[in-house]
UniProtKB/Swiss-Prot annotation:
One of its GO terms (molecular function) is N-methylcoclaurine 3'-monooxygenase activity. Belongs to the cytochrome P450 family. SUPFAM superfamilies: Cytochrome P450 (SSF48264). One of its GO terms (biological process) is (S)-reticuline biosynthetic process. GO terms for cellular component: endoplasmic reticulum. The keyword Metal-binding applies. Pathway: Alkaloid biosynthesis; (S)-reticuline biosynthesis; (S)-reticuline from (S)-norcoclaurine: step 3/4. The gene is CYP80B3. It comes from Papaver somniferum (Opium poppy). Coiled coil: none annotated. The lineage of its organism: Eukaryota, Viridiplantae, Streptophyta, Embryophyta, Tracheophyta. It is found in: Endoplasmic reticulum. This is (S)-N-methylcoclaurine 3'-hydroxylase isozyme 1. The keyword Iron applies. Keywords: Alkaloid metabolism, Endoplasmic reticulum, Heme, Iron, Metal-binding, Monooxygenase, Oxidoreductase.
Amino acid sequence: SLVAVVITTFLYLIFRDSSPKGLPPGPKPWPIVGNLLQLGEKPHSQFAQLAETYGDLFSLKLGSETVVVASTPLAASEILKTHDRVLSGRYVFQSFRVKEHVENSIVWSECNETWKKLRKVCRTELFTQKMIESQAEVRESKAMEMVEYLKKNVGNEVKIAEVVFGTLVNIFGNLIFSQNIFKLGDESSGSVEMKEHLWRMLELGNSTNPADYFPFLGKFDLFGQSKDVADCLQGIYSVWGAMLKERKIAKQHNNSKKNDFVEILLDSGLDDQQINALLMEIFGAGTETSASTIEWALSELTKNPQVTANMRLELLSVVGKRPVKESDIPNMPYLQAFVKETLRLHPATPLLLPRRALETCKVLNYTIPKECQIMVNAWGIGRDPKRWTDPLKFSPERFLNSSIDFKGNDFELIPFGAGRRICPGVPLATQFISLIVSSLVQNFDWGFPKGMDPSQLIMEEKFGLTLQKEPPLYIVPKTRD
């Protein structure tokens, strides 16, 4: 009809010239939806293809949002290092805009005084080498509990991500509160509701919210995602609120100290909301991303028997038949190379967490306008054939004689980010990922349901805040001779 033509023409004229001048090149956007329809279900993969056409930096219009994507080590270095301060703002997903949480969050808040205070506690108290080493026995005991649980399920099909996720929840329960959250295999034990809330948060983080592309929809919460996040946070806070209350009372009646995060946080001067937000992010980031990484690691091991054999030779040489200890990890270069290779191909957050420009600035001679959203395609950088030989081949050997690391200085490998926004828990995360993987390799062979051949294993990805394997990995543990 004539009315439809007039409306369409009007909207086109509005959106046609809405992009700021001087942006990096990119595909031509459609009216209203921009480039949304070009992304498909795997934006990280589509971004890598677009980089082949448009280069280091390209721009998109996602709904009404202007987005710039960095796709090479050079562009990543410019974003995360050279212009780190001015591009250090955080774009907060609509579903996670829970005021009390965002204002006290180390992940989502601006780099303000509260953020600096929280960051300092992480850097100087929680994730120091001394603190990590002092809690090694806790992580080792939880890893062995996982091994014992799987030994009881030899011959049975297990969803390994759930087993690992539960193990990580208990690891963090002990690191933070000095207690298990629940018992593996017993769904009626302990604070199972907290495990369920954490799992639900993972699902919400991996869901799409149209309000991220059309912010005016945020006020309506059409799909109830914001309410779901708020309810999950409240449920989690209520569980450990009781634990914190008990600890405060105990501290008032005796002077004994426990070697855990809560002891440090209660002595740090943080208020309850800051403690709640920090614990949520330690639990959330530590469990969700690490469980995904370990699932991918085991998937690669089952598809690459020679890699498994190489790791077992190293384990036998360094560890023998006793349980693996974290102190063994520095003496196992192949294990370390294996973890790097897993993170290269399967970074848990494929586009990192989006940044936001605090001011208009120039990057590689292009204009990045104020409030622009910036993504760094860590997944694409890790698979770039210009940077890696045979990039799709899983080969830990590529790191054996290489100084490349994932600590934020080598921009061809940035699974944890870089700059002031780098994940503060990198030293801890790499320890328990290495510990759990090596413990599983040492103790088990693996089969597949219905005798499926490893070559048939599907290695598809499900895009979200974390990059999950699709379908999930189901394997059958077998005792080793």
